Amino acid sequence: MNKFSVIFKLSFINTIFFYLPVLANNSPVDYVNTLVGTQSKFELSTGNTYPAIAMPWGMNFWTPQTGDMGDGWTYTYNADKIKGFKQTHQPSPWMNDYGQFALMPVTGGVVFEQNQRASWFSHKAEIAKPYYYKVYLADHDVTTEMTVTERASLFRFTFPEEQNSYVIVDAFDKGSYIKIIPEENKIIGYSTRNSGGVPENFKNYFIIVFDKPFQFTAVALDNAIKTNQTEIEGNHAGGIIGFSTHKGEQIHARVASSFISFE
């Protein structure tokens, strides 16, 4: 055995021993990059995927949303703004989605419209795994994290020191409903948005429970904000809740949904 062969083998063994602790602490799922295949658009398909956060055979998936409401290409890698964090059931952009709705944290002024609430983000400040997603929203100085179960999800929003911190709930257009219940730190609603293939009475009912009392409430109908109401139904309904937050304060939201009822 020559000297170079011995050196090579020793180097290989040292490399293996160096990485063994890293490999031992990781599950196979940690090696999945859910951003692969997201550099797609209508004109050119290069994967047609989105970074789904989901359990195997889960009823719902969740994803950051860079596309417009109803756009089958809900997340594209080359986009630079996030407009919401959406519950989705989309198998393919060509088939589109059904029952979708979204949450979005913002700071500063009260807004609802998807482009007004959108925030710049960077892939350098983004973690995308099948079971967990995290991103920093630069315009609002808010970090959003989410994880899921088979039928529910958990959000954690880390806010800056801000008198005007908000979470927007967008039930999307083509028929939706929102009711804010301040005494229970709760928002309920439904989305009927779909691309066909559902029953005539289709609704995706959802309940969102927060762990901090609301200091501000408003609803929106077709992007018009109404501060004197806590319930709205129409083509495009939404809700806005507000808080005063200190630097680094974390607000959690638990989200559950059903195709049957609020119960």
Label the model's feature ranges.
Residues 9-21:
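Bacterial N-terminal signal peptides
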